Amino acid sequence: MKKLVRYIVVCILLSVLPLAAKADSLTYSDSVEISLLTCTPGNEVWAQYGHTAIRYNDIANGNDLVANYGVFSFEQPYFIPRFVLGMTDYRIGISTTEEMLFIYSYEGRGIIEQVLNLTKEEKYKVYLALKKNLLPENVVYRYNFFYDNCTTRAQHMLLDHLNGNTKYTSDNTKPLPSFREMIHEWNKNDAWTQFGEDILLGVTADLPVKTEEQKLFLPDNLRKYIEGAIHNGQPLVKQTSVLLQPSKSSEEASTFISPFQVAIAFAILAISILLIEYKKKMALWGWDILLMAVSGVIGLLLFVMIFSCHPSVSLNMIIFLFNPLALFLIPSVVKSIRRKQKHWWWTAWEVSIIIGFIGSFFQKIPVPILIVALFLLLNCVFHQWLIKNVYTATIENKAK
């Protein structure tokens, strides 16, 4: 119980202290040691990729601090709309190393420290850069998951202030991965997170990155990148140590029903309804309302993402499968079904879905989405069959 109370108190302090961090939090002496801290993944969605921070340890002054570029608050005005549009602001925060170790120990997460082999001049340059970064006008930055996050900020803070020549090792025998492949490595056991990522990420997320540096948005990639680096003839990392061993596995299988299972259940329901409709030679317009409403909402979200500042989301072929127009055409489509009249929407949606299927050759579209889209296509085909063989025939018979 005491440990829980202490954890809550420290969480409150960590949520307040970083926001109040000032440039005068830092001190400097010749005894300063600067390290890269790489944290193992947590269970929350935003923690599944790990975390990066900078340890600034002024031994002579007893000032052992951690600079953290991952501070955000759900209480920011319009947080969710801003997040969807890629307009979320993060900030740098300062806490003591002891506080950080306590929090990560409680969460069962590990921390690896790499002490950098820097000259006094390089340490002082990092010190000045951190002080400047902690000025009130500089603490906030516009977060970008692939290009400007807590790891890339730490990367530039440390590596951009090195003097002389630095060589980084890389495996040139392996092709460079795509953004989608890299992030999937960190949530391969969380089917729903991967599914959500695959819905939102578009065509460009499947293109290989162009340089090794573009892989450094992930904490463990940065750790490996500097691990074998040679700086002016000496190893850039002079000492590696494990500050905390992870005590909880972040790779536990998801306990929820998977997206694939949901898609199979939908397929069984869709087949059953389709057989009933075919037997009765009529459309169940309530079912069509449901399909069009859900498809339209998903499509509308993907349409909004076109204007998002998030990378790799604007060109997304899934929008052709879940066309946003469906949401706005429900009244006229239902009216035509009840009056047994032809409607252009079924042909348009059929063409749109076919384009989406063609797009799956260029973009990784989740199998559950393709299963659902297949039955949306069959529903369109059934409506066209109904128009041609039932509605038209009925009208012709009445005319006679």
PLM features: what roles do these ranges have?
Residues 146-216, 220-223:
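Soluble non-transmembrane domains of integral membrane proteins
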Residues 274-278, 285, 289-400:
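Generic detector of multi-pass transmembrane helix bundles and their immediately adjacent loops
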Residues 24-28, 240-246, 256, 387-400:
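Membrane-proximal intrinsically disordered regions of secretory-pathway and membrane-system proteins
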Residues 100-176, 376, 380-383:
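Active-site nucleophile-His-acid catalytic modules used for acyl/amide transfer and hydrolysis
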Residues 29-109:
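Glycine-rich catalytic cores of cysteine/serine-nucleophile enzymes that process amide/ester linkages
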Residues 1-25, 394-400:
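Bacterial Sec-dependent N-terminal signal peptides
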